[in-house]
């Protein structure tokens, strides 16, 4: 089976056998300007991974594809503003035709939570959340050892919490979410401008400057950390997780975020969940995709075995 992680800047694929052993991986830049181009890249990267594993594509029984967006009953992703054309009708059917195998879809942050449950910090924890803070913001929720998606697949879309410094009534913020506007990649740059940081054009450069001792950059990072703490303070009383796993390109900067984040959380909330940085790093989503594909493949296999024994399935 194949797991595929689709991001704004890359497409990654991993091939695994039925034991879950990863036998090949491939990655390709994907600065696509259209959904059609991105779908073609998904197909080429997935097939390249299978070829690297030494198997023909016809032997791939299931592909799990993860990307930003809500995968509910609409037949196409919703709220996937970071990928061009991704919310239009027919996108999922086009991916199925491109891959020409059984395909399951899931939100990328949900996949990261599954990855942590399978091979990361969530292996021994039944109730935890994966808080992704990067270009976008989202939450993967595991309750009782199972992924929780809600009635319409939108559980964890915390980007739309009307929190932090962004005005939730602003039309631009309603499109991408007030919390994402405040603490996502653009929020880091906004905080940097507010504190007087000069020359930084990416969130990574702001963190690099802070790590190098730039006081204004450290102030900007502290503002972002306080916004993350506000998000956690809103989440914890509702879900009561034993563990909050921070992930994403911003969330993984624990050396800079932890002290102001925990200080602000102490000021905001009486609840003290354990907070850790993802042990899987940027591999979390891909491992989750493989885990989802593995579950789907095993379900198909056992259904066929039961059907062969005359068991109703």
Question: Where are the regions that the model predicts?
Answer:
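ATP-binding/phosphotransfer module of carbohydrate and carboxylate kinases, centering on a glycine-rich
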Residues: 1-59, 99-101, 119, 165-313
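Phosphate-binding/catalytic loop of phosphoryl-transfer enzymes
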Residues: 4, 18, 59-177, 293-313
